[in-house]
């Protein structure tokens, strides 16, 4: 049996074209139909009695799958051709059919790239811009942070400058530079108070003074500027000194309150070319002028003497206080001078009462002079009436100053005849006794005088006898008593019953 391959190929081509025309659906449906037709034709191929040809190449296999699919679809329409298909052996399609199939397959993936390209564009658009801004922000973040802190401490430095000397403080502990004096001053705190240790020309010297004071005040554990071993000699010397004494030693070692071109305390160069000595801040005054001197040392010594007189041996001086032992008065002499000074301005014994009481006691003051008052007080303290009795010249001094009112006669020294008669009567009991001038006293019943103001017992019980009262009434004391009664003061004058001698009475009347 002979088979014409050409006829079979033509019939297959015609069937394929017919199937392509009938299948106007999508590519997916044709593929499914091809799978179904392939599955249906597989048993027919296995049952064929013809000798199978050698295996076709890979492109022939693909083409064979298409041919079988088309032949299966065409078999339903033409049953007469079934025998021919079973007997026919599949063969590779002709060359022009292979090209037609390749062209057909190239049309399927042509629509796929468009969505892929669109998806890629959507994926690439949002991603690139995101990382770039983040990188830029991180790069610029660190630089702006450092600039703000530096300007803050600058205003604090400006505040310190207002404090004046504190703006140029030293690097050493307890040392400060003062522009007003141009020196380095050292201070230390003790019991809540700042103790001045002195002014120095260099900060190093001021720091040394502070270290010595700190060791003295706080012990070897104190915070100091230099090593503790540098002050071993000073520690041995300061054991026998108190804090105050040691501070005075440090101040003497300093340059003191130097002004101008002088290195001594309290000395300055005057515009006239001489050296002026003055002591400041004493008794609330700005300074005390001590004079001009030809040499700087003389002015410094004048300052030292004035400081010792005002502040004692503990005064801060330019030189050792022992150098002025022969030039300064001793303590006893200084005390004596103070006593004389106080007595010269003290009130007399008769006026030691209160001002109110003196104003209502008829103004009877015996002692008016400061000199007489001081002599009287000294004699009263010594309790030596005989010494006063031997001084007749004191009597006229007591009557130098008349009373305040001249219209009324002086009650102590009456100048009328009645007073002379009373004195003659009182003189008869004892004519040889002379009564000193201080025998007359003023006594107030409301305010009796203290006992120590009466050096001699002038008063007795007989002073209130009728004879004494009548004598007082007949004398000039009657007017004083009347005035005292009007003033509601019962002040009387008592005297010794022994009347004064004729010499004293005559001397008394002669004076008036």
From Swiss-Prot:
Residues 51-60, 141-154 have a biased composition (Pro residues). Keywords: DNA-binding, Nucleus, Repeat, Transcription, Transcription regulation. Residues 78-88 have a biased composition (Acidic residues). A motif (Nuclear localization signal) lies at residues 159-168. Residues 39-50, 460-492 have a biased composition (Low complexity). Its main location: nucleus. A motif (EAR) lies at residues 341-345. Residues 1-100, 119-174, 347-367, 401-433, 460-512 are annotated as: Disordered. Belongs to the AP2/ERF transcription factor family. AP2 subfamily. This is APETALA2-like protein 1. It comes from Oryza sativa subsp. indica (Rice). The lineage of its organism: Eukaryota, Viridiplantae, Streptophyta, Embryophyta, Tracheophyta.
